[in-house]
Amino acid sequence: RHVLELKIIEKAAVNRTAKGLKDMALALKNRAKYAAAENLIACVEADIAFHSAIAESCGNNILTALYDTLSVHVNKFFMEIYKDTTPFLASQQQHENLMQAIKDKNIQQAVAVANQIIQHK
């Protein structure tokens, strides 16, 4: 999963569009809102919507389709391992930073932030 996400993020930093950035921003806003409201199900869905918007922005239909398939399993996994929205609140700023790096087309920064998110640092 990590290799796929990193490749998607690299490509999204190059190929992102205004629509993709808008979709990412909306998903991030919802992620923060649902995390603050302690609505785990909606928060997980918003988190996946954010990463799906990144996948849509990568410009590679195969990678996007792979992520769409993977996201079903990620949802199930997150619902098993997370009991509340605390980890989502804790990683919100990192997700904001990831979107900013993609917006800035800064591949190196986007990958660095993604690695922090993946490693829960």
Give a label for each model feature.
Residues R1-A27:
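Amphipathic alpha-helical dimerization/coiled-coil segments
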Residues R1-K11, N61-V72:
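Conserved segment of winged-helix/HTH DNA-binding domains
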Residues I9-T17, Y34-E38, C58-G59, M79-D84:
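A ubiquitous short alpha-helical element
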Residues A25-A37, E45-H51, A65-K121:
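C-terminal all-alpha effector/ligand-binding and dimerization domain
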Residues I54:
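Short basic (Lys/Arg) and small-residue
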